[in-house]
């Protein structure tokens, strides 16, 4: 057997190192890909099974669930315009792209590993080709069950359940304090002025309604109960607002809304709740939502408003 000269040995060793490095790189890449595609099975309320990332890192949210993902420390890369306009989300959505279901190409460029939205969107089939897509029917679940369901989708069910339990306990405690301050029989109305139309709300249409009526057990006026409880909301003309206002009014107003001149109208000033200084004005952009982050904020708002010394 011939002995290898130094040059041949050196060349073979070099080739071996290169091959070894390539092999190590390939193994590393395979491990990275394996970690990146690790999935768990999410089962929808209709029984459909969807493979979703075990630890989603690039989520596009096309509906009002961004606050839950922020609260559960899940990274968002794309979000709907309504959520982007919520000042309470600004820190959690810093640098996040604003998209809609129509922006298929833009969403593709974001390279999401999970898409969450409502089932009334267009392009759902195209979106599901980009990433696992989970769509919900608005109002199909109770507002707290919806939060837990979002937790399941992003593999944060334990965190979601713990939040719900703590929130309910706190809301009920604060509710008892509020009843003690305003009286067991006091009535509360939630109203909002939007696009030259006034709306009153039932007990499950965001804007703090779930907290006031479901968790705290506060009373709504009979006129609100008759018209808005089942439907969720009821549109009225501004001038008849007084017919629906209880002892207290939660008025949701957009900070930039040019249609708030009614606040200076005589008919508004003559409403008893207004005359008694029992109107609490909330920023509509923070009240449109009923995700966990927004509910925490709304609960604090009610505690400070009703129990202010």
Please place each PLM-identified region on the residue numbering:
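Short helix-initiation/N-cap motifs at beta->coil->alpha
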Residues: 44-46, 94-105, 228-238
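Proline-aspartate-enriched helix->loop->beta-strand connector
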Residues: 104, 111-116, 132, 241, ...
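Structured C-terminal subdomain patch of bacterial secreted/periplasmic proteins
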Residues: 244-309
